Structures are given as C-alpha cells and as structure tokens.
C-alpha cells in the first residue's frame, strides 16, 4: 500500500507540474497540451475505438517479440555461460548486432521478413535479445563453485548441474535482464511499426503528429505506451518475487 500511495503522490505531483508549465509558460496546445485536454482526447479515442485498435496491435507485437527474444536469449545465455568457446564464437556477432542502431536495421529486417507481423516481432525480439542474453550468461557463471563440485562428486552431469544449480543461481540476474528487456520490447514494437505498419501505437503517433497535427492524441498514444510498459514490467517483477528465493 505504501508503494501504491507513493506512486499516486508522484503522479499527482507530475500532473500538477505539467499543468503549471502549460499555464505559466502559456504553452499553445500544439506544443504542450494541458493534462485535462489530453485526458479529454483520451476519452474520445477510447470511445471511438481508435486507441483500442492500435493498442491491441502493439500489445500482440510486444508479447510475441518479448517471448521470442527472451526465450532465445536465455538459451543463448546459458550456452555462453557454460562454454568459453561458444562465447568466443558468438560474442562478436551478438555485440555487432547490438552496436548497429535498431532504427537502421528495422527497414532491412522488414524487407527480409516480408513485412507484416512476423517482421515486427523479429525487430522486437532483436532489441530484447542482448540484455537478457548477457544477464543470463553472467548469472550462469555466478553459480557457487563449491556447490558445483559437490554435485559433480555426486555424479551429476552438466544438464543436471545446470537445472539444479546454475539456473536457480542465475534467476535473480536473469530477471534483471528481463526487466530491461520487457521495457525494450515496447520500444522495439514502436520502432518496428515506424519501419512499416498500417496500425499500432507507433503508427498512431505518426498519424497524430504528421497527418492530423493532433498533439493531444500523440500524448494519449505515448501515455498508453507508458502504461503498457509499466504493466509488463510489473508482471516481470511479480514473477520474480514468486520464483526467486531471496
């Protein structure tokens, strides 16, 4: 309850500060709309179904992209953590892919995957992959060597040691990567939509900004993205609390 109360207080302070800026600075609506203007535009967007339509598309992209990227990242991270040879072979490619801006790669991936949902999921998965893979690798290598030696002496093979020791030991670090990855999934979905999509919150932002000159609608789309990001981050934190033994 204390956390919820603190969050509500910080939200209230943010909204009040936002309102003061618009009043004191005499900001025109097309530059910085007042909170009540954005709220009213949000109600209209929800009532007309526009927000639901675009948010639904983005949600699907985030869920599929995060699931694909996180699954592949965890498996790759385990392999990297257990084998120095695998790390030496794969690390240059992983780092190189991460070093290239996703905005530059997105149009190319859109072409390779033929556009559509598959392309956007691939872009989202790529941006999610790196932090989770690295976190998993670090976590796997943090397993207690004494416990590992004890399991070896009891006849446990590599797979059993991974299941009983390395993965449980790595979970706190893996979940740290998942927290970062799930927020990056939201960014990845928007970037993917900018690369080529007919709907989604990223598309709605472009329509509001460039087509309709509707700044309040753009703020509504941004707020929806923030809420989605917070919700998914909260789910990861909840899963962490249930699965990680402190």
Label every PLM stretch briefly.
Residues 84, 141, 172, 219-246:
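C-terminal transmembrane helix and the adjacent membrane-cytosol boundary/short C-terminal tail
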Residues 122-126, 159-192:
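Transmembrane alpha-helices
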Residues 64-94, 111:
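Transmembrane-helix boundary motif in ABC transporter permease subunits
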Residues 95-131, 138-139:
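Generic hydrophobic transmembrane alpha-helix motif, especially the helices
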Residues 2-26:
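N-terminal signal-anchor transmembrane alpha helix
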Residues 140-146, 150-170, 211:
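Short helix-to-coil transition segments within interhelical loops
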């Amino acid at each position: 309850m204390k956390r919820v109360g603190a969050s509500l207080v910080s939200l209230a302070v943010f909204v009040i500060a936002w309102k003061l800026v618009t009043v004191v600075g005499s900001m025109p609506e097309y530059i910085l709309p007042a909170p009540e203007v954005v709220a009213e535009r949000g109600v209209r967007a929800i009532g007309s179904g526009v927000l639901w339509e675009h948010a639904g598309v983005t949600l699907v992209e985030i869920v599929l992209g995060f699931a694909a990227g996180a699954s592949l990242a965890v498996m790759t991270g385990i392999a990297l953590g257990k084998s120095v040879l695998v790390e030496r072979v794969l690390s240059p490619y992983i780092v190189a892919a991460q070093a290239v801006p996703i905005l530059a790669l997105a149009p190319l991936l859109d072409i390779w995957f033929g556009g559509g949902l598959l392309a956007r999921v691939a872009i989202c998965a790529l941006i999610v992959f790196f932090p989770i893979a690295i976190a998993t690798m670090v976590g796997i290598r943090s397993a207690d060597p004494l416990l590992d030696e004890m399991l070896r002496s009891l006849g446990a093979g590599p797979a059993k040691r991974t299941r009983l020791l390395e993965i449980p030991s790595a979970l706190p670090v893996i979940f740290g990567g998942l927290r970062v990855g799930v927020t990056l999934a939201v960014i990845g979905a928007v970037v993917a939509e900018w690369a080529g999509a007919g709907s989604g919150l990223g598309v709605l932002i472009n329509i509001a900004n460039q087509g309709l000159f509707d700044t309040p609608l753009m703020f509504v789309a941004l707020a929806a993205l923030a809420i989605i990001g917070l919700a998914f981050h909260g789910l990861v934190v909840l899963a962490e609390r249930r699965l990680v033994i402190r």
